Amino acid sequence: MTEYILLIISTALINNFVLVKFLGLCPFMGVSKKIETAIGMSLATMFVLTVASISAYLIDTYILTPLSATFLRTLVFILVIAVVVQFTEMVINKTSPTLYRLLGIFLPLITTNCAVLGVALLNINQAHTLTQSVIYGFGASLGFGLVLVLFAALRERLAAADVPHVFKGASIALITAGLMSLAFMGFTGLVR
């Protein structure tokens, strides 16, 4: 049990996919202007990352490896992620049309979110078990959601702040993301 908790902490805080591995930067910068949208995107990505981790593990273990077709991993994982995203999109459209409209183009873009594919491939490369794959995917999505919501809150405050004209928009957003990355470096010695 301790191993799984450490895996979640390590994935969410220490080896955060956005701030350390620089995966998932497109939705990080694109959906982080309002907290409501960031929360919705975080929840959608959390579901997709967790289900994609399970699916990728099962497909690799029971189909690709026995057939010696591991060279097809990336292509198959992209297809699996696309199916999971389409399912998620249908569920969000039925349950919350407002959130569906707010997420707009970024919801289908989860398919091409490199963090989702990165988690699936890293699970296989690190030889995780099914349970570890699920926890790794959940921890990665937890870290992604945490960073996305914190960044959205900071961007909302910056929108109301008196920022010099030169730094308005993407400039101050990138500076803020860099400072967040430095802050998350403080978690480095947390897990040994």
Curated annotation (Swiss-Prot):
Sorted keywords for this record are:
Cell inner membrane, Cell membrane, Electron transport, Membrane, Translocase, Transmembrane, Transmembrane helix, Transport
Q: Does the keyword Lipoprotein apply?
A: no
For this record, an example GO cellular component is: plasma membrane
Function, as annotated: Part of a membrane-bound complex that couples electron transfer with translocation of ions across the membrane.
Under the subunit heading, UniProt states: The complex is composed of six subunits: RnfA, RnfB, RnfC, RnfD, RnfE and RnfG.
Q: Which family does it belong to?
A: Belongs to the NqrDE/RnfAE family.
Stated name of the protein = Ion-translocating oxidoreductase complex subunit A
Organism of this sequence: Pasteurella multocida (strain Pm70)
Q: Which gene encodes it?
A: rnfA
